[in-house]
Regions:
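H-loop/switch region of ABC-family ATPase nucleotide-binding domains
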Residues: 140-141
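Conserved ABC ATPase "signature" C-loop
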Residues: 158-159
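Conserved ABC ATPase "signature" region
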Residues: 47, 51, 58-76
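Catalytic Walker B motif of ABC-type/P-loop ATPase nucleotide-binding domains
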Residues: 105-108
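Conserved ABC transporter NBD signature motif
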Residues: 2-11, 20
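ABC ATPase nucleotide-binding domains
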Residues: 172-222
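Conserved ABC ATPase signature
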Residues: 80-84, 88
């Protein structure tokens, strides 16, 4: 593969890492790989990046308190990072990133090693951040979650962009299997039944959408 990467119209190879980190934050697939291991509490762990940036103490406290609240982990602030569950640790990792106040957060399969409850915790936290205007880019293979929480979906195959559209449009494509993608279960059921929205001619992608169509028939709109 080849090409160029731009962030905010700036090619990244021309930008210092320190400056780029202030624009883009990355959350790893495995939260254990993101924990410094040098801090005794969750609060100190979130402060680590801010300390490296030389953020003034008062501003640092404000950002840490805000990120703890945003990720709903205030009650864990005095716990040791490695005493947290997988979902809690991933939320701590996200909190440490949003404390840096980046414009964009990139998440690399952040729920791949989490149980259903932990996955739901992370997706809800990410949704809250998105609603606050933070750009979220997530690589994820859990189709039901993508359908329920995404505004737009990129369909990739062998490193190439196939499509970029709303979840309903993406999962209603007839060639998904050719690209190694399995649509959400609700979408597959409605496809078998030939039930789709009248307005857009798309299959439902969430339980709520499927329930509405199955209850009211194809004349209903979603």
């Amino acid at each position: 593969y080849g090409g160029k990467v731009f962030v905010d119209d700036i090619e990244v190879r021309h930008v210092e890492v320190d400056d780029l980190c202030r624009k883009v934050g990355i959350v790893f697939q495995n939260p254990f790989n993101q924990v410094t291991g040098s801090k005794l509490t969750v609060y100190e762990e979130i402060a680590f990046g801010l300390e490296n940036f030389g953020i003034p103490r008062d501003e640092m406290i404000r950002r840490i308190d805000r990120s703890l609240e945003e990720l709903d982990i205030v009650r864990f602030k005095d716990r040791a990072p490695f005493d947290l569950s997988g979902g809690q640790m991933q939320r701590m990792a996200i909190a440490s990133i949003i404390a840096m106040e980046p414009e964009v957060i990139i998440l690399d399969e952040p729920t791949s090693q989490l149980d259903p409850q932990g996955s739901e915790e992370v997706f809800r936290a990410v949704q809250r951040l998105s609603r606050q205007g933070i750009t979220i880019i997530m690589a994820e293979h859990k189709m039901e979650k993508i359908a329920a929480y995404s505004d737009r979906v990129m369909l990739l195959d062998d490193g190439k962009l196939v499509d970029f559209d709303a979840p309903g449009a993406i999962f209603s494509r007839n060639d998904l299997k050719e690209h190694g993608v399995i649509a959400p279960s609700y979408t597959r059921i409605c496809r078998e039944l030939g039930i789709k929205t009248k307005e857009k001619g798309q299959y439902p992608v969430t339980l709520e959408e499927a329930g509405a169509l199955l209850t009211y028939g194809q004349e209903g709109t979603v």
